[in-house]
Amino acid sequence: DEFVKVPGTTFKNTNGDAAVDHYQRVEEDIRLMAEMGLKTYRFSIAWARIFPTSMDEVNQKGLDFYHKLIDLCLENGIEPMVTIYHWDLPQFLQEKYRGWESREVITDFKKYAVTLFEAYGSKVKYWITINEQNIFTRMGWLTAQHPPKMSGEEKLYYQVNHNVFLAHAEAVLAFQDLVPDGMIGASFALHPSYAIDCKPENVVAKMDYDDLKNYWWMDIYAHGRYPKAAMKYLQ
């Protein structure tokens, strides 16, 4: 919310104060979804709406809104699918320790995730930890298109990604204990690649591309380790 108020960061200098006004129109929105025959609604919970000023104080009104949203989905035959983090880090954490740049965020993210699991785990079966980690980290620390608006910080970019991986893992482990009958994973913006021909050097180039642009994230989500090419690059 703070970032989009900076002139020049968004198209036509729009901001998120009202956006699509889902908070006020939630009943109408879910009714329209039901009329359209939608069977699943994937939505994101705003971390800053649950913990707006401190990780020591939960905003009950925020929890209540998502209870209402989830209940409306279920009443209308729509399966809720919750995304825990969709790029809305609370501003106070950015100011306190620079957010994802610090390992302190791992503990705070786990606390936030556990709060959601305890609140909604009996109603929601399908969960997503992080939305498109490879996008928000690249645009935040390499191309300055997203907060914290940094460019060319390659070493920091990889450290941030490592912190996000650890936060994801902590959330998954907590989820398995608290919502044993649920399903959880990460959302990833895959960048498909194809070798230009069957020459061995081009096939290997395609494999290296996948290791550096896709499996760097996917292997960690699935296997808990970096691909060999990624590790060699980091070293």
Where do the PLM segments sit?
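N-terminal structural segment of carbohydrate-active enzymes
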Residues: 1-59, 63, 69-72, 76
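Active-site region of glycoside hydrolase catalytic domains
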Residues: 1-10, 53-55, 64-235
